[in-house]
Amino acid sequence: MEPTTAQEQLPAPEQLPAPEANAPKRDPENGDAAADHQAQEPPSKKARLDDSADSNGQTADAPAPRMKGVAPIKPEFIIDQQPTRGQTASDANADDAAEAAHHDGRADEQNGKKKKKKTGQNTNRTFGRSEDAKGLCSSVNFRPEFSPAECTFGEKCRYEHDLRTYLKEHKREDLTTFNGMCPVWDVHGKCFVGWKCRFVGSHSEERETADGRKELVLIEDEERKKKVQRLVPFAGEDGAVNVASMEDKIALARRKMDFPRAGPYSAWLENTSRTIEKELHKRHRAAPVGAETKDGESKDAESKDADSKDEKEENRAMYVEPPFMPSEKRRLYFGPETPALAPLTTQGNMPFRRLCVELGAQFTYSEMAMSLPLIQGNKSEWALMRAHESEMLPPTMLPGADIVQGYDNSKDMKFGAQIAANKPWQAFKATEALAKVTPNLRVIDLNCGCPIDLVFKDGAGSALLEHPSKLEKIIRGMNTVSDQIPITVKIRMGTKDNNPNALKLTERLLLGGYETSLLHHDGAAGAAAITLHGRSRQQRYTRQADWEYISECAALIKRLNEKTDAVTDTIREPDARTQPNGGKVYFLGNGDCYSHVDYDNHINNAGVDAVMLGRGPLIKPWLFEEIQAGQYLDKSATERLAMIEKFCKYGLEAWGSDEHGVGTTRRFLMEWLSFTRRYVPIGLLEHLPPYINDRPPAFRGRNELETLLASANYKDWLKISEMFLGPAHKDFKFEPKHKSNSYDEAEG
């Protein structure tokens, strides 16, 4: 069990030391034994593998052999501590074991009674409500005290209209963090939540009117507003892009939005597939009994090839062409210098992605959105498509990079959307809606890897791996209706450990299956890139990702890319619109990348074009910096705390600095802290490189703050949040996603 700290009063953020300064000291009255071991925090260190460890990854001062599955922490930092009240279950419980206990739906029985499970997910989690005692009417919120707008609800309005009453009785006192300055107003020169802001005192004042009365007014700083420089011209004044308008969401909810491509294509696919299926079944039933020779051998190869060719010709004459062809797509590029941040459920929010982009992430993805709620205009689902303007900038490329013909880096961007669907028509309509409502997307990625039972049993996510024909149809249809946005797909090795099918599925996506060869002149399904997570759905995180299997898939895609012309149907020249990314399909590997050593090994030995990172950046978001620098970065505790502070500022910009926005920021911060606390500083390790699945014994950090950041106690996470977001609302609640702080569902 990792240690928890005493519940002492921590210093305010403005009192925290600089990254190079001493760490805050614990109050001696608390009697914390860790204070006796207090060490001055070292500055951030850059350690190359060659400098810090010998060739087998063992440091010179570490004679003890490395134990599998256990983080090799130096003995002087290991402590023996019993679990304390309020602490979460030990990390000795494997992540997937906790989830398996939940999904299995069975519990051990003793004396005829079910034992209460101590592991598994905290289902039906609630976070309470962070809101004012009584809300302020929108007719007042952005107006001077004596000049409110007319309330459309009149006397029936249930919100407060008296500004001073609201500020005095219904709104909590202003926060004093960030020196009492509203982070949003400090950056933009105006606050986007008006009088509801928890820092409203920093951008409001009382002015005397002509009749001698005192009037409360909001202030905007024109100088700050002039300094704001939008990174892209289509960003909103808050720096957000891909914001679905209320009109579009209402049109979707009321089924008023037209789908001129998805509708006809879905109807064509349904009719044609039904005809194909009927014809195939009829031919199977009509197969002659004497088709085999006396020796049991089948007909000779030439005869079979001739029959197959005749059959294809007959089908092409019989079946109607699709109502339209795909639009030519923007060209993509993935390379060794472009590490990608994986789509992450809950954790892949805009503030976290923005932080990762600053630290070197070249590609980001939205959280997985379900297609049906998107089509229905669901507000929360469309909110997942919001991106920061920094995600609209082109990726960094090395000079001389091997790019496909027609690729224009200046028109490229970092952010893509990921969706899940269990029916082709849902995927088609969601794709067309995204292309129409949020056109600033690098790609639209189809999730075929999500292992969550709720998604799998609905036929989406990794369930599509068991239905390759259906998956291929979805990719083809998405590619047809997505306008200029390329389509990509993320898959797993398979659903079962003993039956990986990613190789066959990859080949099908590049060459096309038998059924679709009867409908299409060209083989490729249209996926511009394929990402393979080197685990099965059944495996979850019980073992390391299988990079040997990923390497096999990479080799297959390389061979097929090189022989595209040879395997393409030669009846006619392939239409450029049907060729994904100019004929080249990129391949990304995903799984367990936790250091620049892992990244370089995968690039050089697995043959992937790039690596997608999921859990690694959640634990240490500066992993992108390490990859770029080619060395370990031993971040100090105060440097890590500065990242947390930056996340809080970005959260207030994204969700608002009012009571609701502060509560939302706190919730997602604590979700993230449940990952960051797993980080073991490089300076504490005996062996390198670190492994993401290694579990540390209870340890203390090099100073009090480092120990606090490693705490497994969610109450300590709340304490960290209060350093920047002030005391939590009385109704705020937080329950860790897993009782053992598992993180199996973070990445699909």
From Swiss-Prot:
One of its GO terms (molecular function) is flavin adenine dinucleotide binding. Pfam families: Dus. It is an enzyme of class 1 (oxidoreductase). GO terms for cellular component: cytoplasm; nuclear periphery. The keyword 4Fe-4S does not apply. Its EC number is 1.3.1.89, 1.3.1.-. Belongs to the Dus family. Dus3 subfamily. This is tRNA-dihydrouridine(47) synthase [NAD(P)(+)]. It comes from Aspergillus niger (strain ATCC MYA-4892 / CBS 513.88 / FGSC A1513). The lineage of its organism: Eukaryota, Fungi, Dikarya, Ascomycota, Pezizomycotina.
